[in-house]
């Protein structure tokens, strides 16, 4: 059930961000209580992982927005707070790494082929959605492969 709630939210966010470059607060406020209720009845282990994930997701993107002076939108910041509540710390970190990698590769490719102009903003929501879904579904395997490269 939690996966369907998360995926439903990410689909709506992706469409909205691609079409309007906005992640609506109304969408996040609709899904936030659903995710909180799900985490009460289906808690992560340890129980505080959801709270820490939400704080980390929100705080990390807020820090990036401050450092980049607006390079990250408010919707992205709030979205990662909700995602963190849903998936916890480990998957939030992996999701962010995957989203950043996908955004960089696709953004640089689009620049190289002149599909977008330098300095023009691109929506990050679809990359957040893709990174979150990949991390949620395959996170443990991805982390195991990554760690096996070094240990």
Summary of predicted features, one role per range:
Residues 41, 67, 112-113, 137-138:
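Helix-loop junctions at the membrane-solvent interface of multi-pass transporters
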Residues 36-39, 133-137:
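Aromatic-anchored segments of alpha-helical transmembrane domains
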Residues 20, 124-127, 138, 146:
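Aromatic side chains
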Residues 8-105, 145-151:
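Functional transmembrane core segments of multi-pass inner-membrane proteins
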Residues 1-2:
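Transmembrane helix-loop-helix
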């Amino acid at each position: 059930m939690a996966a369907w709630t998360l995926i439903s939210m990410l689909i709506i966010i992706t469409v909205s961000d691609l079409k309007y470059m906005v992640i609506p607060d109304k969408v996040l406020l609709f899904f936030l209580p659903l995710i909180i209720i799900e985490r009460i009845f289906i808690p992560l282990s340890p129980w505080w992982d959801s709270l820490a994930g939400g704080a980390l997701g929100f705080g990390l993107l807020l820090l990036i927005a401050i450092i980049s002076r607006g390079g990250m939108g408010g919707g992205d910041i709030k979205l990662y707070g909700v995602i963190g509540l849903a998936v916890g710390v480990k998957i939030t970190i992996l999701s962010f790494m995957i989203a950043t990698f996908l955004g960089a590769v696709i953004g640089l490719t689009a620049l190289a082929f002149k599909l977008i102009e330098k300095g023009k903003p691109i929506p990050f929501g679809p990359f957040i959605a893709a990174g979150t879904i990949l991390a949620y579904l395959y996170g443990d395997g991805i982390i195991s492969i990554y760690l096996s490269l070094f240990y």
